[in-house]
Swiss-Prot record:
Function recorded in the entry: Cell division protein that is part of the divisome complex and is recruited early to the Z-ring. Probably stimulates Z-ring formation, perhaps through the cross-linking of FtsZ protofilaments. Its function overlaps with FtsA.
A cellular component annotation (GO) from this entry: cytoplasm
Family statement: Belongs to the SepF family.
Subunit relationships: Homodimer. Interacts with FtsZ.
Organism: Streptomyces coelicolor (strain ATCC BAA-471 / A3(2) / M145)
A Gene Ontology biological process term: FtsZ-dependent cytokinesis
Gene name for this UniProt entry: sepF1
Protein name, per record: Cell division protein SepF 1
Primary location class: cytoplasm
Subcellular location: Cytoplasm
Amino acid sequence: MGSVRKASAWLGLVDDNNDDERYYDDDYSEGPESGDAWVTDPRVKVASDVAEEKGRRIATVTPDSFRDARAIGELFRDGVPVIVNLTAMEGTDAKRVVDFAAGLIFGLRGSIERVSTRVFLLSPADTQVISGESAAHRSDGFFNQS
């Protein structure tokens, strides 16, 4: 009952009907509810299961032009390692995509590795890449290509 209604009832301007009587406690039972157990839709997954599956995905992108760099950025931002194959691109656009990828890995604290000529692997910060080559053959990294 609102405060104005209570004041009106106290002054005798309206009937003092107790509106709370329309709710009955008998309609509600205490304790567990009888019936079938709630079943989760099999398409719904627990967040931790989805997070584990994200670690199992690797994307391969073969851009035709610099406009395709957005797809690389969106995948990498979502935590998916991306293999970028620049063999189908012209040299100037390929350099722009590599510069874009370098900005991505710097901004999101990832890493970039050269897999082969004009093919690069962008790895998010939480991804571990195991190389099969020995330490003697390994170069000083992506940024030392002089």
